[in-house]
C-alpha cells in the first residue's frame, strides 16, 4: 500500500497521479478523516497532559493532608475520556487503513499514460511469425488429432474452463515446466521453491489481492478456523516468504522461482476465451520473484523481463514486449512489461507473461525490510514478480507454431531431452 505520509502531505498530487490510472481517490473523505484524526489526537494529548498534572497534584495534596477526592474524581473522568478518545482514534485510523488497502500503486514517471490496453506501447519484437502453406488448426483441433486435449472429459469432472491432457501432450506440458525451471535456476540465478497452494488471507493482503479482488479467488471456508484461499499465482506464496523479515544487505537480491498450479475464478471474463486453454480456472505457471534494494528495482525489472523473454527465444516462438500504460497496469505495479506470444490461429499476439516492479507497495503491506548498511536502519525492500512463463499458454503457442499439415506437432529442439525420444506428436 501507499505510504500514509503521502496522503497527509501530498494528497492532491497523489490523486492526480492515480487519476492517470483511472482511479478516483475520494479526497474529501480522506481530508475529513484526517481533520477528525488530528482533532481527536490533539484533544487526547491535552487530556493526557492534564491528567498527568492532576496526578502530580494528588501526591502534593496528600502530603499536605488535603482532601484529594475532587482531584481523584477529575483523574478518573479524564481516564474515561482518554479511553473514549483512544477508541475513536483507533476507529478513524482503521477507516484510513481500510481506504489505503483499496488504493493502487502510483505509476512510475516512465510509464506511458493511457486509459486502456489500446494505449500500451510496443517496446520490441523478436522473431517472425511463420507463413504456413496449409490451412492451420487451432490448439483445440490439434489436440483432437492426437487425442491429447480433452475438454469434454474435463467438463464432466469440473465444468467449463478446465482441460484434461493425455499422453505426449501431457508430457509436453510437463517438459515445458521442467525446461523453464531448469533455465531459471541453471542460467538466471533463481532458487527453486515448493510452496503451499493454500494460503490464508494475510498472505493475499500482503501481495494486494485482498481485500479488493476477493471475487477472483477460490475460497475454502472452515468452521472455527481461518479460511483458506487457493493461490492465484505463486507470487503470493513466494513474496510472502519475506513478510515480517529484516534481511541483511548481503542476502539481496533474492531470486525465487516456483512451478505451481494457479486457480482463478475469472469472475470478470464471462464470454471471453471460452474455447480452449487460453483462460482456465486451473493452470500451471512458473513464477519468478525478486526482492531487491530499492535503488536497483528498475534495473531488476529489465533483467526479470529478459529472463522471461529467454524462454520464448529458446523455444523459437515469436513474441513482442509491451510497456503497459497507466490505465492497464495491475493494482500493485509501478511499472509493467507484458510479453505476448504469436498465436497463429488468432493471427495476433496474446499475453503469456507479465513482469512487474511493485516498488515498496507489497513490502509495506507485509513489513518486509532490509537493513541499509549506510544508515544501519531497517527500510522497506522492493519486490518484483513475473511469469516465466504461463505453462498452458506456452503449450498453446508450441502446438500452433510447430504444427504440420497433417495435424502432427514437431517437438521444439530444447524440449527433446525431456520427451523420452518423442520428436513428433501425432
UniProtKB/Swiss-Prot annotation:
GO term, biological process aspect, one: selenocysteine biosynthetic process
SUPFAM superfamilies, sorted: Class II aaRS and biotin synthetases, tRNA-binding arm
GO CC aspect terms: cytoplasm
Catalytic activity: tRNA(Ser) + L-serine + ATP = L-seryl-tRNA(Ser) + AMP + diphosphate + H(+); tRNA(Sec) + L-serine + ATP = L-seryl-tRNA(Sec) + AMP + diphosphate + H(+)
Key word ATP-binding present: yes
Keywords: Aminoacyl-tRNA synthetase, ATP-binding, Cytoplasm, Ligase, Nucleotide-binding, Protein biosynthesis
Pathway membership: Aminoacyl-tRNA biosynthesis; selenocysteinyl-tRNA(Sec) biosynthesis; L-seryl-tRNA(Sec) from L-serine and tRNA(Sec): step 1/1
UniProt key word Ligase: yes
Subcellular location: Cytoplasm
Principal subcellular localization: cytoplasm
Residues the entry annotates as binding ATP: 264-266, 351-354
CDD domains listed in its UniProt record: SerRS_core
Gene3D superfamilies reported in the protein's UniProt record: Bira Bifunctional Protein, Domain 2, Serine-tRNA synthetase, tRNA binding domain
E.C. designation(s): 6.1.1.11
One GO molecular-function entry: ATP binding
Enzyme class: ligase
Cross-referenced InterPro entries: aa-tRNA-synt_IIb, aa-tRNA-synth_II, aa-tRNA-synth_II/BPL/LPL, Ser-tRNA-ligase_type_1, Ser-tRNA-synth_1_N, SerRS_1_N_sf, SerRS_core, tRNA-bd_arm
Annotated L-serine binding sites: 233-235, 287, 387
Family: Belongs to the class-II aminoacyl-tRNA synthetase family. Type-1 seryl-tRNA synthetase subfamily.
Domain topic, free-text comment: Consists of two distinct domains, a catalytic core and a N-terminal extension that is involved in tRNA binding.
Function statement: Catalyzes the attachment of serine to tRNA(Ser). Is also able to aminoacylate tRNA(Sec) with serine, to form the misacylated tRNA L-seryl-tRNA(Sec), which will be further converted into selenocysteinyl-tRNA(Sec).
Subunit note: Homodimer. The tRNA molecule binds across the dimer.
NCBIfam families: serS
Protein name: Serine--tRNA ligase
Organism: Pseudomonas putida (strain GB-1)
Gene name linked to the record: serS
